[in-house]
Amino acid sequence: MEDKKTALIIEGGGQRGVFSFGITDTFINRAYDPFDIYIGVSNGVAVLYWYLIRETDNNLEKMLFAAKGDYLSYKNIFTGKDIFKFHQMFKDGEKMFKPNIENIKNNIDGKDYIAVVTDAIEANAEYYSFGDDEWMPKMIASLEHCLFW
């Protein structure tokens, strides 16, 4: 008999994360986690991050924090710099919201947490599993967008 697996897939789309946070908050509040695999695309990776930590506090504040103008500069298109300062945003966000990384490690034990990333050259989807100490680069890669296609 073949074992069936259940996946929770959270899409990206910037502010659609507000809706996704509402769903995952309800799952947390009801201790609902029948999932074997967690797959996040773009902002969905960040939403799953907080779901797997089991953090429901301040999710609106997290979305507003990420939308602040401090981290976004369209003029950087012309200077060759990053349009969105993801590294700085995550660094500042970790100080402000203090995520418990041990919780996420415990909650994915024996399960898969996957980030979907678009290859910048070929525009193909690539799938990256998370392991110890690999959170930041994979989250940032999933969140970054190619501007010109």
Predicted regions and their residues:
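Patatin-like phospholipase
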Residues: M1-V41, Y49-W149
